[in-house]
Design a protein with these regions (language model features):
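A short alpha-helical cap/connector motif
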Residues: 1-116
Length: 116
């Protein structure tokens, strides 16, 4: 993984984790996966050289960045779904910051509607 992206992910996780600690209501939290889980997903994507990925529940884009970075290694593409527009905007800004937005479609849609 590119060192700039890795540093960005580390900082983002720390920021989200600190923010989550302040939120009493679980629904107000970012609900990011743990770095070890994200790294495992990245390894699995790389091992299978997956080309088309679907993420349901973008939240703030932490796992999205991991998935997109892994997908780009093999010319893959990620579609990520989130029902909350503000979270899609946040995730999109993170994707742009690390130049992964070109391989990722961020859709503001209920996953149930998308999967019909």
């Amino acid at each position: 993984m590119d060192s700039k992206i890795k540093a960005y992910l580390t900082e983002l996780y720390q920021s989200y984790h600190a923010d989550d600690q302040k939120q009493a209501d679980r629904l107000n939290r970012w609900r990011s996966i743990e770095p070890e889980s994200a790294e495992l997903l990245s390894v699995l994507i790389s091992a299978t050289q997956a080309k088309n990925l679907l993420e349901i529940g973008t939240s703030g884009g932490y796992s999205t960045l991991w998935l997109a970075e892994a997908a780009q290694q093999y010319g893959g593409h990620l579609t990520t779904l989130e029902i909350e527009a503000d979270r899609i905007a946040t995730a999109t800004s993170h994707l742009k910051a690390v130049k992964l937005n070109e391989i990722c479609d961020t859709l503001c849609i209920d996953a149930a509607d998308f999967l019909k």
